[in-house]
Amino acid sequence: MTDRFAVFGNPISHSKSPQIHAMFAKETGQTLTYEAILAPLDGFAEAVTAFMAAGGCGANVTVPFKEQAFTLCDELSDDARIAGAVNTLIKLPDGRLRGDNTDGMGLVADLIRHGVELNNKRVLLVGAGGAARGALLPLVRAGAKLTISNRTLSKAEALAALCPKVNVEVISGSHIRSPFDVIINSTSASLSGDLPVIAANAIDNQTVCYDMMYGAKPTVFNEWARSLGAKICIDGLGMLVGQAAESFYLWRRVRPNAAPVLQTLRQSLISGV
């Protein structure tokens, strides 16, 4: 029987995951099916259990179920534990569920794909919500000298405390006095046409700026960063493809090439398909 995978969410019709994983499977010569499943808001656990019982081998999880997926798992990766959320479910040989969070790995992979060095670089992570939590451990593993900025400073401090063995600094965005090597906007501010609170001093002509949001046009954050002379501005489409590639690897132990998939999705975005 062909191995079955799926993505669970609500809403889910917009998901690019089936298209992405179909391209990954074709490129790597893997035989599998991957579908989008609309889970009821009050029936996520039941939907996943039914899918796995019917032969499902693994799944992705998107909003609003990542925290519920966390509680559903029998074991968790370090990334998932720090994130407090799961976006990848792996059915183990004994039927138990292992949860992982590949969002941060996708972010780091995309930065590396753009030639961005993270080791010993001053990295500002803007925001302290779920997206920031998912990025925290992979950025620390990559050797970043991490600073967290958030509108509510206590949330940034709580996030920094999740990595007690590493010196993660916390700062108010309006108090930044010198430029960072890399700035990562993990907030969803760009979706509403807003900017996070960051002093213009944070950016100079050597700063790489990354917005986890993406669209057919440059995000508001990236437009602002470019106007201040940022060296490179990158949106989050590559992070989407990167996290999918990491999920695919966890399931199949074959690492797909993200670049051609990213190019296809970018062209679709621009053309409005």
From Swiss-Prot:
Source domain of life: Bacteria
Residues binding shikimate, per UniProt: 15-17, 62, 87, 103, 214
Catalysed transformations (reactions): shikimate + NADP(+) = 3-dehydroshikimate + NADPH + H(+)
MF terms (GO), sorted A to Z: NADP binding; shikimate 3-dehydrogenase (NADP+) activity
Keywords of the record: Amino-acid biosynthesis, Aromatic amino acid biosynthesis, NADP, Oxidoreductase
Enzyme Commission (EC) number: 1.1.1.25
Pathway named in the protein's UniProt entry: Metabolic intermediate biosynthesis; chorismate biosynthesis; chorismate from D-erythrose 4-phosphate and phosphoenolpyruvate: step 4/7
Positions that bind NADP(+): 78, 127-131, 150-155, 212, 236
InterPro entries: Aminoacid_DH-like_N_sf, NAD(P)-bd_dom_sf, SDH_C, Shikimate_DH, Shikimate_DH-bd_N, Shikimate_DH_fam, Shikm_DH/Glu-tRNA_Rdtase
GO biological processes: amino acid biosynthetic process; aromatic amino acid family biosynthetic process; chorismate biosynthetic process; shikimate metabolic process
Entry's Gene Ontology cellular component terms: cytosol
Catalytic EC class: oxidoreductase
Residues at the active site: 66
Alphabetical list of HAMAP family matching this protein: Shikimate_DH_AroE
Role this protein plays: Involved in the biosynthesis of the chorismate, which leads to the biosynthesis of aromatic amino acids. Catalyzes the reversible NADPH linked reduction of 3-dehydroshikimate (DHSA) to yield shikimate (SA).
NCBIfam families in alphabetical order: aroE (TIGR00507), PRK00258.1-2 (NF001310)
Family: Belongs to the shikimate dehydrogenase family.
Subunit structure: Homodimer.
Protein name: Shikimate dehydrogenase (NADP(+))
